[in-house]
Amino acid sequence: VGRVEWKQDMNKVVSFLKSLTWKQIVLSVIIFVCLALWAGLTVFATVKKNGLLDQTAAKRWSDENNAAQISCFFTESTEVDKNRIRTFENDLDKVLLEASITAPNENARLWADAYSASGKLTLSSGKTSLADAAAIGIGGDYFLFHPVQLLYGSYFSGNDLMHDKVIVDEEAAWQLFGSNDVVGMEVRIGGVPHYIAGVIKREEGRFAKAAGLNKTVIYVSCETLEEFGVTEGIDSYEIVMPNPVKNFAYNNVKEKFGMDETRMWVVENSARFSLKGLLT
């Protein structure tokens, strides 16, 4: 009985296909190809975005798709210090208040930001030293935007009262201590004790290579880098904030910093790494 029913069903399918015109067949093929292409592009975009965690802070900050991540890059001749950033933050709070954008509760934050400076410094442990290592001095919630892969320990915040935390990669840990499980160990920077907060896996791939992150990079506070290292000062600023309408966040960040394009380059990461942005 089962074979008879199957044969009858197949006959119906064959009859249906024979009843189609060439125009209907071509249209059906086009629709199928478009659906397959759309599905493939969606998977491609998702995989690519997931590999760029430092570009997707807005998605991690809000599941409601109403936030934007904005990055600002300053030229070498542009001087930006913590006071300038504090002034910007105060101006931003006023903008959000005027737009009647408020936090859902008193413990919630409307925005989070970070800034960083690139440079070099030397750190030592006993008779072993790591000279002129590439360093990033951080401020604010830097690791919210750059969740580098921790092997041991934890991140630290640029807002910490003490500025004596260090994050190293596993290669640097081996060079300094002969082990990669070194959380809490002391290193000296400029003769001042600092302590290993975390050990990370060194980043790989062409994006990491382009950013110079495929080699040893030490993460310290901006204060440590400025005092004991060599740096040109703060060179980037990042924020994730409400974006109730298109370009609200981008336009306000650009306006409140008040710098022209010869001094500051502004990017909306969340738009740049949308499906449309990834394909253009």
Question: Residue spans of the language-model regions?
Answer:
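Solvent-exposed, non-transmembrane alpha-helical starts
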Residues: 79-90, 128-133, 162-164, 203-218, ...
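N-terminal targeting leaders of exported, membrane, and organelle-targeted proteins
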Residues: 22, 45, 273-280
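Mid-to-C-terminal secondary-structure elements
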Residues: 141-150, 168-263, 267-278
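The feature marks short, hydrophobic/small-residue-biased sequence motifs that occur predominantly
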Residues: 108-155, 160
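Hydrophobic secretory-pathway targeting helix
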Residues: 13-54
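N-terminal amphipathic/basic-hydrophobic helices that include classical n-h-c signal peptides
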Residues: 1-9
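Membrane-proximal extracellular/periplasmic loop immediately following the first transmembrane helix
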Residues: 43-118
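Extracytoplasmic
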Residues: 67, 130, 160-163, 234
